[in-house]
């Protein structure tokens, strides 16, 4: 099947995806096609969910080693053997001293969480965005609608991903007591209870709602600049996704540091802060970070976070847009009369 967006067949499908019926008249703008985003009802919820699941799995799988380094770099009281100055140096040291596969420990948990989480995330975003754009900006693309839609999608996404985040971050830490995802889940459940899997949920939302608002608004804005006709354009999706992710990541690093502390419950850090038991709550996490490392503590791992998020969101958007285009194209071709 020819998938090039410039082919005659693809252009015809793109017009149908955009609601442009050449023989029916309606749905065309001055250029002969409407926005790629304005898919007809044939772009079903299942299409968005399938494309979203594929995007989430590939994004987190490819970038997982960098995510492991980011988690360690955000440690407030790292072991002397786990202090790193660069991502490359960290990965090299981890593989040399802890084993070649060590940076991938916990990736199975992330894949199991990322698939359903991103499926709901993109499906919710697409439908909320379309509904809110009709309310706020009937004839165009409202950045307010994009931000709100991204925030609402985050509520569903984080409800699924938070337990996976807790488990994978504990597996990622240096000298982790947990040797497998199952043993980690059992230990946390037995010693800390079910609530431990959602201890950082409010912090996660406090971080991810502004992150995703910035992310979606920036992505949609950049798409308007580099891809104004909203055709399927892989290069534009990669550029817009990467820049949007980098900006959102840098702006929300302080919240990510607090989330990591709540997820990992670093014993050394809590002891230095004279905290007994378990740390909970965003305000307490912020105070603890400042107490131990000052203002600089809020930006621990910012380099790794930006380097992780930039290709991560580029992968996510390019994969998502490809599968959305591919699946809708297949649906339309299957319905076309021969």
From Swiss-Prot:
GO terms for molecular function: ferrous iron transmembrane transporter activity; iron ion transmembrane transporter activity. Coiled coil: none annotated. It is a multi-pass membrane protein. InterPro entries: Mitochondrial_sb/sol_carrier, Mt_carrier_dom_sf. It catalyses: Fe(2+)(in) = Fe(2+)(out). It comes from the Eukaryota. Residues 1-42 are annotated as: Disordered. One of its GO terms (biological process) is iron import into the mitochondrion. Mitochondrial iron transporter that specifically mediates iron uptake in developing erythroid cells, thereby playing an essential role in heme biosynthesis. Interacts with ACB10; this interaction stabilizes SLC25A37 and enhances the function of SLC25A37 to import mitochondrial iron during erythroid differentiation. This is Mitoferrin-1. It comes from Homo sapiens (Human).
């Amino acid at each position: 099947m020819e998938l090039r967006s410039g082919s005659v067949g693809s252009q015809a499908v793109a017009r149908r995806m955009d609601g442009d019926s050449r023989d029916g008249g309606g749905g065309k703008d001055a250029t002969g096609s409407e926005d790629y985003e304005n898919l007809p009802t044939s772009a079903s919820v299942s299409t968005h969910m399938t494309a979203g699941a594929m995007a989430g799995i590939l994004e987190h799988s490819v970038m997982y080693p960098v995510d492991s380094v980011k988690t360690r770099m955000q440690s407030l009281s790292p072991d002397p053997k786990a202090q790193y100055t660069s991502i490359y140096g960290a990965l090299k040291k981890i593989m040399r001293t802890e084993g070649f596969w060590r940076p991938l420990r916990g990736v199975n948990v992330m894949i199991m969480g990322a698939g359903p989480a991103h499926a709901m995330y993109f499906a919710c975003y697409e439908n909320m965005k379309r509904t809110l754009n009709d309310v706020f900006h009937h004839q165009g693309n409202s950045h307010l609608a994009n931000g709100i839609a991204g925030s609402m999608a985050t509520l569903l996404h984080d409800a699924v991903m938070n337990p996976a985040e807790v488990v994978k971050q504990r597996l990622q830490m240096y000298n982790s007591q947990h040797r497998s995802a199952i043993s980690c889940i059992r230990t946390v459940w037995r010693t800390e209870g079910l609530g431990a899997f959602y201890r950082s949920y409010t912090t996660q939302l406090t971080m991810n709602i502004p992150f995703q608002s910035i992310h979606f608004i920036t992505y949609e804005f950049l798409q308007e600049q580099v891809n104004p006709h909203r055709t399927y354009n892989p290069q534009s999706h990669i550029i817009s996704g990467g820049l949007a992710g980098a900006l959102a990541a840098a702006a929300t690093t302080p919240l990510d540091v607090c989330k990591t502390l709540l997820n990992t419950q670093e014993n050394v850090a809590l002891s230095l802060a004279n905290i007994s038991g378990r740390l909970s709550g965003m305000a307490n996490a912020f105070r603890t970070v400042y107490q131990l490392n000052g203002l600089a503590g809020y930006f621990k791992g910012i380099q790794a976070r930006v380097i992780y998020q930039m290709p991560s969101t580029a992968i996510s958007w390019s994969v998502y847009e490809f599968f959305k285009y591919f699946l809708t194209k297949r649906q339309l071709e299957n319905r076309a009369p021969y």
